[in-house]
Amino acid sequence: MEKLIREEYVEQGYFFKALRERLARSEALQDVMENVREEILSTTKLPLAIDYLRAELSHSGMMSLAMKKLSHYFTAFQAFVVASAEDEKGRFDLRVALDVLRFDAEFRATDPTPVATFFYQFETLCRNRLDYDKGLSAILEDPTFDEGWRNWLTFVRQQIGLIELTDLVLSLIHI
């Protein structure tokens, strides 16, 4: 996946914010998506993505499957966050996931550095007690990271829990 243009991230941020706010009012997710779709800029690709999300949601009941299939538009990390919220065995709430996605999209609109992106995503894993292995695998696929970063992230994924995060961060200096 390549990085999207700024306007796409701005619209994604609005989309996730609107979903979060309207779900709090107990509106059905498909209905909310249909209404929000009409509010999104038609010059972006998000309305098409919303159509696909709605179709997959009505077919399988899961939004994360569509996000994974739309890997050219949504990052693996975004799909992972939604999949974690959809996991019936987990404790991660969809409303929290939508907040995470909103902040992620708004953050990406500012063209953040790889360091900032990593720490935002890693903090999301830690604060919400999400699966480190699956989460770091998703982070590895982020278009923000180049080959050196991917090598370091692979190392982190293998060593997390065995080595303190501070030592892993210090190892980054040598890349």
Give residue spans per PLM region.
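Catalytic metal-binding core of the metallo-beta-lactamase
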Residues: 1-173
